[in-house]
Amino acid sequence: MSLTTYPHIYKKEQILKLKRLNKLSNDRKFFFSSVKGTLPGIISHCNNINEILGRCYLGICKLNSFFGLSKDPSDKLSVSKSPSVYTLPSKIFKEGGGNGDNTTTQTDILKNAQDQVILSKKIDELQTQVKELSSKIEPEPLTKEDIKKTYETLSRIESGLKGIIGIE
């Protein structure tokens, strides 16, 4: 049986197993509706919700402890809050920026975004104009010749179908 089939978290190069809160249920299956509306079914439903919320809370505590944001109540060796966690991402972004002068690229991006906004407004205006023009267009009235042509084509189709089916 694999260790990862049980609820766990990976912290400081160790796999810490979470305790099972309900010994009678499967770790990966939870039922949130009962077949019968009896009191034991409702209790089981509430226990399943409680178990998932408990696991989520423990996971959040362990993640916060791993990043040094808070002390984990279930781990005696966890460290307390450290402000160095917040400075690390800012250092990473500053190092990745090159010389730190990104104003030219930012202005180019801003100009492109403004151009796209202008183009999208123009497209919207053109769409409204097309809708207005299409509503103004009136269909041509049918003539007797058009009606005769459609009647002839329908009669040919009908005779062809009768020939295929074998009726008269």
Swiss-Prot record:
Q: Which domain of life is it from?
A: Viruses
Annotated Pfam families:
Cauli_AT
Described purpose of this protein according to its UniProt entry:
This protein is involved in virus transmission.
Q: Which family does it belong to?
A: Belongs to the caulimoviridae ORF II family.
Q: What is this protein called?
A: Aphid transmission protein
Protein source organism: Carnation etched ring virus (CERV)
Organism phylogeny: Viruses, Riboviria, Pararnavirae, Artverviricota, Revtraviricetes
